Amino acid sequence: MLRRVMIKETWEVAKNVRAFRFDEKLDFIPGQFIMLWLPGINEKPFSLADKDLIVVKKVGPFTSKLFKLEEGDYVWIRGPYGNGFKSVEGKVALVAGGIGIPPIYALAKYGNLEEKVLIYGARSKEELATLDIENYVDEVVITTDDGSAGIKGFPTDVLARRKVEFSQVYACGPEVMLAKVLEIMNYERTQISAERYMKCGIGICGSCALGPYLVCRDGPVFTGEQLKGTEIGKFSRLPDGRIKSLR
């Protein structure tokens, strides 16, 4: 059901990235998402970073409008929706790229996990949106494309070197990164938060199809085994249904 919530707090997290805290706390499983509606603009899905928190990158008209809102302004939300991450025993890797950090942050904070290694990458130091995730993990490994922070390279470079350490790999980020994670792990011991263009968020419109699945209903979190043989990392679909190559 659509309901109005107030923006209780908002602040800059990184370059072109803002956090928005609402005046209502939601019961959710890390990996689930909400649909956020701006009247007269549109409605978009956002993964929850916390019970009352989303973290957003400015990428188009919708997010540009959202960035203009201030504390005390109102937005409309529904959800949470979808399937979230499932906790496993042992040492795990939390792999995030760019703005893929929100569901990974939620998992680090609320997941019933024994030992957590965060492997997080961005283009540059100014684009790292770590929040305070270091308080909820046992180890932090940072990578940047340009070497301005941490290791120069990509999160998947680190994962490839250390994959035998982990009983499970959780990942969210650009789809090409997710495809590489699946390749490195041979589609085993992985849970991936996938993204597709989404309209309804409740499994009716079919716009978020990924192989035989609907991301909003069957995901957004999938196991590697589920994604084997799908188009993950190869192509996605634009709002009008046309195919967009990811290679």
From Swiss-Prot:
The entry's keywords: 2Fe-2S, Electron transport, FAD, Flavoprotein, Iron, Iron-sulfur, Metal-binding, Pyrimidine biosynthesis, Transport
Gene Ontology biological process: 'de novo' UMP biosynthetic process
Coiled-coil annotated residue ranges, if any: none
Keyword Electron transport: yes
Domain of life: Archaea
GO MF annotations in UniProt: 2 iron, 2 sulfur cluster binding; electron transfer activity; flavin adenine dinucleotide binding; metal ion binding; oxidoreductase activity
InterPro entries: Cyt_c3_hydrogenase_gsu (IPR012165), Dihydroorotate_DH_ele_sf (IPR037117), Dihydroorotate_DH_Fe-S-bd (IPR019480), Dihydroorotate_DHASE_ETsu (IPR023455), FAD-bd_FR_type (IPR017927), FNR_nucleotide-bd (IPR039261), PyrK_electron_transfer (IPR050353), Riboflavin_synthase-like_b-brl (IPR017938)
Pathway assigned in UniProt: Pyrimidine metabolism; UMP biosynthesis via de novo pathway; orotate from (S)-dihydroorotate (NAD(+) route): step 1/1
Required cofactor names: [2Fe-2S] cluster; FAD
Pfam families given in the database record: DHODB_Fe-S_bind (PF10418)
Cofactor descriptive note: Binds 1 [2Fe-2S] cluster per subunit.
Binding-site positions, [2Fe-2S] cluster: 200, 205, 208, 216
Domain FAD-binding FR-type: 1-87
Family named by the database record: Belongs to the PyrK family.
NCBIfam families: PRK00054.1-1 (NF000796)
Complex formation: Heterotetramer of 2 PyrK and 2 PyrD type B subunits.
Function: Responsible for channeling the electrons from the oxidation of dihydroorotate from the FMN redox center in the PyrD type B subunit to the ultimate electron acceptor NAD(+).
Protein name as annotated: Probable dihydroorotate dehydrogenase B (NAD(+)), electron transfer subunit
Organism: Pyrococcus abyssi (strain GE5 / Orsay)
